[in-house]
Structure formats: structure tokens, C-alpha cells
Amino acid sequence: MRSYEFAEDYRKNDAICRADVGIGPYKRPPISTAHTQMIRKYPMRNIALTLKYLGTAYHGWQVQKTVTTVGQTLEEAAAAVVGHPVHMTGCGRTDAGVHARVYVANFRTSARIPCDRIPYALNTHLPEDIVVTNAMEVHEDFNAIGSCVKKEYTYLIYNSGIRDPFYVNRAWFYPKHLDETVMQRAADCFIGTHDFAAVRSVGTDVKSTVRTVYDYKVERDGDLISLRVSANGFLYNTVSYTHLTLPTTERV
């Protein structure tokens, strides 16, 4: 996941993420009496975080019951900083092993810590493969997933007869030569508004399987081919399935 763009008018997006609370591999502690008193004394603030992470060691973003995730790790760090349990809303559900260059999440807190100090405070409690780069106070209606209007993913293919150890966990090793011009013609077919029900994991609960793809670029730099796609949203595993389809187009 490479970047996200957000609507300027946050008040247009008042839907709050209803992700389950307390289902992670840890049990979120109950809100203490001291925190309840703090809430009464100070208004709740909505804090948006920008972060980047290497996803190799994590089972995606979403908090899960028995495995370690990026969302869970960030929640634990934030709770240690602000002194009370928090719930993070992420701008998208990255899959296991997926990295993020620019990822946005938000949470609510009554703590008075200045925003310019939050990244430093959080990073002292985070592992080195997750880094918070910015924090800012946003409108109370801002929601990282509801306010997100564009998402961009980049998928890398290492196209060479010999592996490169520096691209392990970073690129798909594909030894047979690929023609990026043929792959680009196939990628162009995905641009526009389409029903992507056929290229997603079954069993996912969504209101609509229609998404709009804004751009899909296939570019080669030596042995490295990058597939970069941007859209208003993606279904579960749609990006992986479409990327894996492109190399096979030469054989059709």
C-alpha cells in the first residue's frame, strides 16, 4: 500500500468504523475511573496518525484473535502513551506480509499530549518495523476509512533467471521473461468502473462489489517490474488477484 488521499470536508464522512473491540490476541483493559474523570474534565480529541511499516512480521492490519497485527501493535503503543485503552481505525485492511509507505489511522483520546510530540512518544513503544511519522488533531467526524477517497498499491515482480536475496519479502520472483507492454494492455482493461466480484476472496461482506480504478501502470526498471494501481477502494484480495493475472496474459 503506497498512499492515500482524503476528502477535504471531513464532515461529509460521519460514519464511524464499527470494527469489533476486544477481539485481539490481547484483552483491552477496561476504562479506569481516572480515565473516566479525565474524559469529564477534558473533551475527547480525534488524532490522525501517518505511519509506515514493514508487514513481514505481521498478519495484516486488522486486529485478530490469535496472531500479531499492525493495528494491535499500534493500539498497545498508543495506550501506553495516553494512559488509557484506545481503538485505532485504519484507512484499509492490508493483508499479511504487505508493507505500507503511507498509511493513515485515527484514534480518540482525552490526553493533552501535543501532536508534535505524539510520533516521538509512540515510536519509543513501537518495534523498529513500524514508524509513526506525523500526528495531527482532526475534525471529530474524520474517520480514516470513511474519509479515504483514493488508495494506491504497488506490487513488485523480480523478473530474472536468478534470484536476488535483497528482494526476498519485497518482490515476487518470476524467472520467465515478461513483456511489460503486453501486461500494460491487460492492465488497461481494469481501468474504469467495474464489478470485481470475480476477483476477490469469497465470503467477504460488502455492500457493493463495484469499484472504480483510476490508473494502472506497468513499468520496468532493469529486472524489476512494478505494477501500480489506484482506485477508490478494493475488495479483499482483489489487488493480489489482478496482479497475479497480468503475467499470464502473454500465454493467452
PLM segments and residue spans:
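Short, low-complexity intrinsically disordered segments enriched in A/P/G/S/L with frequent Arg
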Residues: 2, 19, 23-24, 28-29, ...
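Active-site-flanking beta-strand signature of metal-NTP-handling nucleotidyl enzymes
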Residues: 47-52, 153-154
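Short beta-strand-to-loop capping motifs
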Residues: 51, 107-111, 157, 176, ...
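Short catalytic helix/loop segments, enriched in acidic residues and glycine
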Residues: 66-78
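Short, charge-patterned binding micro-sites
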Residues: 86-110, 141-142
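Short amphipathic alpha-helices in soluble, non-transmembrane regions
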Residues: 118-124
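Non-catalytic RNA-recognition surface used by pseudouridine synthases
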Residues: 130, 135-230, 240
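Conserved small/polar residues in nucleotide/adenosyl-binding loops
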Residues: 242-248
